[in-house]
Design a protein with these regions (language model features):
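C-terminal motif of bacterial Sec signal peptides marking the signal peptidase cleavage site
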Residues: 37-38
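Metal-dependent phosphoester/phosphodiester hydrolase catalytic core
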Residues: 20, 25, 41-403
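N-terminal secretory signal peptides
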Residues: 1-18, 26-34
Length: 403
């Protein structure tokens, strides 16, 4: 067992109280469901506080998170060997964990059955603690959002496939958003998984840009120029990614005590100018999240994202705040090798099969600061893109804190 209820009794919600619920049995960990007392939502998804596996005294003092996205169930998936060899304490599935692309119930059910039959993936799941969110293809179909007609069925199929109990809030909320907290070497690492599909407003496409997809690809390959998508920012006040209920939930999550906060976004948060899916298509929503991070004084926020079929690091500089970094890892089976614009790109683009690693560890023994080591790795586990951050660099300036 990884711990008991008393291991986390010091954690409090936004209302200053921690309601301890029943232990959920598991061979790898002991999760504890923590309802957000006083949350503005009527039926919020719960946060889950989970004691990380005790680390041997001779082992490195770190918490290792692996992450990835975009695994087509009809293709070989050899990458799980390398991910397993990295021995992560947690794997975060960032969406497109299967490709349903379904317009009818029978197809949707069949695709989930195919996903459950991918033995390398399922064997990895049996051996490694993991959490998951969906993107469009496992939600239902390409680029779908709130109008997808099978979303309630998809919600239940997702919960079945990812072993959510019958009374899980993910089965009854307006989406599958969920949050977790892990404790390692006396520090708290929070993983927040917003649902960017269930309530998302229909995307806005520029008719002058939207042409035959095959023709766009051919032009890009022949010209050697970056290929920009056809989606444009929707600046209408009502356009949303999350919906108001989920926004209230997210605010509560950002107030939960944590040292490092990883927001698992199924689409890129920091990228700008690609013309494909991302928070950039909803500039009011992205600005709202930046402001929410500021008003809740949530420090140590970093984004993990998927979707793009390549890997890279991006960031947004926030006036009066700290840089918001976005580590994109995609895909586990899918590769896009045509250059795509991104004004906020901060690394080389890794256009090959990949997964991400993040080691959270003390900078030096006895100090308060933490080091966040990112590595975007190939199918053999070799790091191709790396980035190192410190928790001290993910904090508000002192004058901002006291303003």
């Amino acid at each position: 067992m990884a711990g008991d209820v008393d291991d986390v009794k010091g954690l409090a919600d936004a209302g200053g109280r921690l309601t301890r619920r029943r232990l959920l049995a598991g061979s790898l960990a002991v999760p504890i469901a923590v309802p957000l007392v006083g949350c503005a939502t009527a039926d919020p998804a719960t946060a889950v506080v989970e004691q990380a596996t005790k680390v041997d005294a001779k082992a490195p003092r770190r918490f290792r998170i692996a992450f990835g996205s975009c695994a087509k169930q009809s293709k070989p998936q050899p990458i799980w060997r390398a991910i397993g060899a990295a021995k992560p304490d947690l794997f975060v599935f960032l969406g497109d964990n299967l490709y349903a692309d379904a317009r009818d119930e029978a197809t949707l059910r069949q695709r989930y059955a195919e996903f459950m039959a991918v033995e390398p993936l399922q064997a990895f799941r049996r051996s490694t603690r993991h959490v998951a969110i969906w993107d469009d293809h496992d939600f239902g179909d390409d680029d779908e959002g709130a109008d997808y007609p099978l979303k309630q069925l998809s919600q239940q199929l997702f919960c079945d496939a990812w072993n959510e109990p019958a009374d899980s809030p993910r089965r009854r909320a307006d989406g599958i958003y969920q949050s977790y907290v892990y404790e390692a070497f006396g520090r708290r690492i929070q993983v927040i998984l917003p649902d960017l599909r269930f309530n998302r407003t229909m995307l806005t496409a520029d008719p002058s840009l939207k042409s035959s997809y095959a023709a766009m690809v051919l032009r890009a390959k022949l010209s050697g120029q970056p290929m920009t998508g056809w989606y444009v920012p929707d600046t209408r006040p009502g356009a949303t990614l999350l919906g108001e209920t989920q926004w209230a939930w997210l605010e509560e999550q950002l107030r939960v005590p944590a040292d490092v906060r990883l927001i698992g976004s199924s689409v890129q948060f920091a990228a700008d100018g690609s013309g494909w899916e991302g928070w950039a298509n909803f500039p009011r929503e992205r600005a709202r999240l930046v402001e929410l991070i500021r008003t809740t004084r949530a420090e140590g926020v970093v984004f993990l994202s998927g979707d793009m079929h390549y890997a890279e690091m991006s960031s947004i500089d926030v006036a009066g705040g700290y840089p918001l970094w976005d580590a994109t890892s995609s895909g586990l089976t899918e590769v896009w090798d045509i250059p795509t614009p991104n004004r906020n790109r901060r690394s080389a683009v890794m256009a090959e099969l990949n997964f991400g690693l993040l080691d959270v560890e003390p900078v030096t023994e006895g100090e308060d600061d933490l080091r966040l080591r990112f590595a975007l790795c190939d199918v053999n586990g070799k790091a191709k893109v790396t980035k190192e951050l410190t928790l001290s660099g993910l904090r508000f300036p002192e004058k901002e804190k006291t303003a």
